[in-house]
Amino acid sequence: MGLHTATAGRQVAFVASMGALGNVLALLTVSIPTPISQVAPDLSHVATLIVALYSGPMLGGITGAIVSIVPFYRFGVAGWYGPLVGFLIIPLKSLTGITAGFLGKKLRPGFATLLGYVPECIATYLFFMLVVPFFLPQVAQYVTQGFVLLVLGKAWIELGIIAVIMEAIKRRDIVGHILGKTN
């Protein structure tokens, strides 16, 4: 039992608490009214990236999946995409946690944050341009290149903000102090 169980317990608690934080951040930000209902701010990746940069790709990916609950409901279940197609939000957000977790071992937190989003960005573009027209032809007329660029532009602005936050958190080792360890 001992150390391994204690470490696993801390990891579960860390991922669960960050998952909750990410969903609270998502609830607060996706509720902000915007001119286009399917283009809303979403800062849930703050939690994904905290876990990815502190605990690596596996836990970052799990946290990415957990923080996608609110965006999945907002844009999938209650949005244009429905629960089946909207379900792809979950692995896409997880992908950012996995990628940033790997990159965070070699790069500064800000760069790992920004580069960690690149695979999700590409997959999101493909989702809008290939998956939505095929599975949701009634929605396809609204998913134009301009719409996709607006969604991705908004996401890059969010990730830029989150990159600054991650630099500050890692530089001051805020999470390390909370967890009782220093890097």
Where are these regions (language model features)?
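Loop-helix junctions at membrane interfaces
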Residues: 1-183
